């Protein structure tokens, strides 16, 4: 017999520990015996548990293989390796006994898998599972039956809960309205327990009388436990829209806000979380909370020290303040900004920091809250988290800083913030770079200390690299150019910054921004930057080689033509009205002329400017009603008049009459430039003519004390310049920003706006490009030198000999204006 033959050699227990161990694995792969053994191990030699016939038996593992006929040699080899793999032999009787045991316990195994609760305690059922990671067929088939059983049990329990609650609610409602406080307390506790189960919770929220009774009990009871149970029930109901509606209709919001003064932590938690759910999901809740004084109560709660509680409270404040100016003012009056800044400095719980930064972001667009946040140290507090791993927190901090940055007046130390902002310029996140550029631009505006810090921290190099990477993204290039414009003028390190731009190959990139597709706000900022770079004589040649002069003249002519055309169409008023993309064309005229004035200090540039046939336009600008344009036009003519040919061309264009008129200007800069040009034009004139000019210049430049002198030499800062509408000019274009942050978003609903699209933000206010004139340099190095300071000349005389004035330093009449 086949069974006997295998048994005499080596019988094998299919449940033996180590089945399929090293002995089987050592068989050669090509050996047919190994294939047979693996087949028996994985599928055939295992009891499936579903042979239900009384006469069936598990197949013996010693059955003859079909590979047995492969020859005595192969069979002998298989038997040898089989013996080597196992150290213990089983007799046929033992194998039969184990097979019989498996057959007898088959039904018990099925019952244990599908209905384990029906087995008697202590009964041991042999398992046929070899690998815990691979369930048997019975175990797999039992899963659906177990799920069905649990579903039936849940349905039975749910129905029981629902029936119980439905029968109990009327009685519990009556008890909640009882005059006996003990009865009310017990009823509140029972309702609270019922609200923890879903079925009974639905029954409670479907009873308006029950919810109203809970609200009354919560409001009128002085018992802490009753209040806690009632508030806990409302908290459970607030997780469902139907529950929120019933709480709202029953007047639950005023009652919940009253609980915000409770000294009990659990009551506070129930109240604030329920209010939070109402604010998020129930229409009308925001107004109800405001009317009930919820904002004041919530701000008072900011002094608590539970981070998770504070996170919910600050999120409520954000929901209430967003888009509602009245709420922002209430938060301000309640001391909210200082409390929020304290949270940003004190805690490290990410969710709390995120929700708090969201409130600050909403408040940062309010002109009343901005100074309060800054004075409380909000700038440095927000800067602490710019290196946080949470991207959403970093982004909120940057947005808030951008909105606040125009309000900073050096009240706190922001050097670490500036250092972090310079580092963020290297970020791969466009939003981060956009915000960082805008913040740097605002913080360096009219702030010499911040300019120095940024320059010393390699900020100029970082800004140039940012321009190179930004390409045509004007939401980045415009604030970056503005920041560069600020750090290259009016501080001790300005000249170093001007050189740094050139040494980092920034001039080609900057000049390129004067060309399309750049729009007017970016062009305006770039013109101002080029004007500052031209203050460094080493930059004159690179700017000329990159075609800066040609492009500046083109922009000047285009802007002037646009101004003339719009004026002829009926635009009146000398201070504005000609806007394009929110930029006054008069500002472009002034900026380009001012840049050409500084570039004209170089003799090669003067020759190039003369060859571009723009002297007639400069002369025409002398008639302009805007004083700043008169000043820069006279300034560039004073440089061009250094060359004899230039002076002759200026005279041929009829400049004598307007220049003579400008000698009487109340602006000292205009009068001084006009005098210089007239003097140089008179060089080759007869002596009598020169004498008359000298007398005229003397009477104009040396006015007596009884005659009112002109305006102060210094231009007002950017914070003193009034908007066009306040000066009687044309009302500003809707896209033109009003005074305030030139790089912040000012809108009643601007709290969550993404970084603005190109040219929608970062406009440069209403002032002239920074700085139009840093000094009244009347030129030098030519044959017609003149000291504008005119030192110790004494009183006016009838005959003033200007030839006797020696050449001197031309910085005596330093003329500073705004960083805008």
Swiss-Prot record:
It holds the Pfam family Arm. CDD domains: CTNNAbd_dArm. GO terms for cellular component: cytoplasm; cytoskeleton. It comes from the Eukaryota. Keywords: Cell adhesion, Cytoplasm, Cytoskeleton, Repeat. GO terms for molecular function: cadherin binding. Residues 1-74, 708-811 are annotated as: Disordered. Its main location: cytoplasm. SUPFAM superfamilies: ARM repeat. Residues 1-16 have a biased composition (Polar residues). It is found in: Cytoplasm; Cytoplasm, Cytoskeleton. Residues 52-63, 785-796 have a biased composition (Low complexity). ARM repeats lie at residues 157-196, 199-239, 241-280, 283-322, 367-405, 406-445, 448-489, 495-535, 603-642, 644-683. InterPro entries: ARM-like, ARM-type_fold, Armadillo, Beta-catenin. Signal peptide: none annotated. GO terms for biological process: cell adhesion. Binds to the cytoplasmic domain of the cell-cell adhesion molecule E-cadherin, and perhaps to other (membrane) proteins. The association of catenins to cadherins produces a complex which is linked to the actin filament network, and which seems to be of primary importance for cadherins cell-adhesion properties. Belongs to the beta-catenin family. This is Catenin beta. It comes from Tripneustes gratilla.
């Amino acid at each position: 017999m086949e069974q006997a033959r295998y048994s005499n050699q080596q019988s094998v227990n299919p449940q033996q520990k180590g089945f399929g161990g090293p002995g089987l694995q050592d068989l050669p792969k090509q050996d047919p015996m190994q294939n047979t053994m693996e087949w028996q191990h994985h599928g055939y030699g295992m009891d499936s548990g579903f042979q239900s016939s009384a006469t069936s038996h598990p197949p013996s593992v010693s059955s003859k293989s079909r590979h047995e006929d492969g020859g005595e040699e192969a069979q002998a080899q298989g038997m040898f390796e089989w013996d080597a793999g196992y150290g213990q032999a089983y007799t046929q009787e033992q194998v039969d006994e184990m097979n019989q045991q498996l057959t007898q316990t088959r039904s018990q195994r099925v019952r244990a898998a599908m209905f384990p609760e029906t087995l008697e305690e202590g009964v041991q059922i042999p398992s046929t599972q070899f690998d815990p990671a691979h369930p048997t067929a019975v175990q797999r088939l039992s899963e659906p039956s177990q799920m069905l059983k649990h579903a039936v049990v849940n349905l039975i329990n749910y129905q029981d809960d629902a029936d119980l609650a439905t029968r109990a609610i009327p009685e519990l409602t009556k008890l909640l309205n009882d005059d006996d406080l003990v009865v009310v307390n017990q009823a509140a506790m029972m309702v609270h327990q019922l609200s923890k189960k879903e079925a009974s919770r639905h029954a409670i929220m479907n009873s308006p009388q029950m919810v109203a009774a809970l609200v009354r009990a919560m409001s009128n009871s002085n018992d802490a436990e009753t209040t806690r149970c009632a508030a806990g029930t409302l908290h459970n109901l607030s997780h469902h829209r139907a529950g929120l509606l019933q709480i709202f209709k029953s007047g639950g919001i005023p009652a919940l806000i009253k609980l915000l003064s409770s000294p009990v932590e659990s009551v506070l938690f129930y109240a604030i979380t329920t209010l939070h759910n109402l604010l998020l999901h129930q229409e009308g809740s925001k107004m109800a909370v405001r009317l009930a004084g919820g904002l004041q109560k919530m701000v008072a709660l900011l002094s608590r020290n539970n981070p998770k509680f504070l996170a919910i409270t600050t999120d409520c404040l954000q929901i209430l303040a967003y888009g509602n100016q009245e709420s922002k003012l209430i938060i301000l009056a309640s001391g909210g900004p200082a409390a929020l800044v304290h949270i940003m400095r004190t805690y490290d719980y990410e969710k709390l920091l995120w929700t708090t930064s969201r409130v600050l972001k909403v408040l940062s667009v309010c002109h009343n809250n901005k100074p309060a946040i800054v004075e409380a140290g909000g700038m440095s507090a927000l800067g602490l988290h710019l290196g946080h791993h949470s991207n959403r927190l970093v982004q909120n901090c940057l947005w808030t800083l951008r909105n606040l940055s125009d309000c900073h007046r050096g009240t706190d130390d922001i050097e670490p913030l500036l250092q972090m902002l310079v580092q963020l310029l290297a970020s791969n996140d466009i939003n981060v770079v956009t915000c960082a550029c805008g913040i740097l631009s605002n913080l360096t505006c009219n702030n010499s200390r911040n300019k120095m810090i940024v320059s010393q921290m390699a900020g100029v190099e970082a800004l140039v690299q940012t321009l190179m990477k930004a390409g045509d993204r004007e939401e980045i290039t415009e604030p970056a150019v503005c920041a560069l414009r600020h750090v290259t003028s009016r501080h001790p390190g300005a000249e170093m910054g001007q050189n740094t731009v050139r040494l980092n190959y920034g001039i080609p990139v900057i000049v390129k921004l004067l060309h399309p597709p750049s729009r007017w706000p970016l062009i305006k900022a770039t013109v101002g930057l080029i004007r500052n770079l031209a203050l460094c004589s080493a930059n004159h040649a690179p700017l000329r080689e990159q075609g800066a002069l040609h492009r500046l003249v083109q922009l000047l002519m285009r802007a002037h033509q646009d101004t003339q055309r719009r004026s002829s169409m009926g635009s009146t008023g000398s201070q504005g009205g000609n806007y394009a993309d929110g930029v006054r064309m008069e500002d472009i005229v002034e900026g380009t002329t001012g840049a050409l004035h500084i570039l004209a200090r170089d003799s090669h540039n003067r020759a190039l400017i003369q060859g571009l046939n723009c002297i007639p336009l400069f002369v025409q600008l002398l008639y302009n009603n805007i004083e700043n344009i008169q000043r820069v036009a006279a300034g560039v003519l004073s440089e061009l008049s250094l060359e004899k040919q230039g002076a002759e061309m200026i005279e041929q264009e009829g400049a004598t009459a307007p220049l003579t008129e400008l000698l009487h200007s109340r602006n000292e800069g205009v009068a001084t430039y006009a005098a210089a040009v007239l003097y140089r034009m008179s060089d080759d004139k007869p002596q009598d003519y020169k004498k008359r000019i000298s007398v005229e210049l003397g009477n104009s430049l040396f006015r007596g004390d009884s005659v009112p002198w002109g305006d102060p030499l210094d231009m007002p800062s950017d914070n003193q310049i009034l908007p066009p509408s306040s000066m009687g000019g044309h009302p500003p274009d809707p896209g033109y920003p009003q005074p305030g942050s030139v790089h912040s978003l000012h809108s009643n609903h601007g709290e969550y706006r993404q970084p603005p699209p190109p040219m929608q933000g970062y406009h440069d206010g209403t002032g002239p490009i920074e700085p139009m004139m840093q000094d009244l340099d009347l030129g030098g190095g030519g044959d017609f030198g003149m000291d504008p300071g005119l030192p110790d000349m004494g009183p006016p005389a009838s005959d003033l000999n200007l030839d006797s004035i020696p050449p001197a330093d031309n910085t005596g009449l330093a003329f500073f204006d705004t960083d805008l």
